[in-house]
Amino acid sequence: MYEYRKMTPAQRREAVEYRRLRERPWHSPPHWEFQGLLQFTISSACYEHQHIIGATPERMTECESTILDVCSHFATHVYAWCILPNHYHLLIQTDQLGALRAELGRCHGRTSFKWNGEDHRRGRHVWHNCLNRGIKSHRHFWASVNYIHHNPVHHGYVQRWQDWPWSSAADFIEHVGRETASKIWREYPVLDYGKTWDFD
């Protein structure tokens, strides 16, 4: 639905009707309710992909700390994360997905208020909705790890994963070793992962 604002009125009506018939939120990504302890990717973007998070390095660090703090209360494990100037990605394990999403929503509200004050932009829409996807397989898990760690390279911010400071990539490489990280990259390629929904 990120293309919604670019659609004609007829295309918008058709898109909303399509979602309504499938009992999905009319203007937002669906949030599937899963039972039990499961793994998910969670992604969220700044409204219209503006580089609001990345206004300053300090704000990037603040966003990273805030998001990871939320995860520390509602996730049993954070496998991978990456904070970029206009969006973030997480790979987590949780049995409290609803509570985690709710707290991320509150976190988005607090950061919106704070950042809009700092930027003298009261009323600016900062965040778009979160999207969560359940991990379906071993291959999906490792492709997600690779995708998240590769994201700063994909978007042209750095040449190597470990050079991006707002990511778990350097810790991951240190933990598993460069050789194992390279093997995982080769065995679980990103290919077109995220092509239709990642945030430029």
Q: What are these model-predicted stretches?
A:
Residues 1-200:
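Short catalytic/metal-binding and nucleic-acid-binding patches
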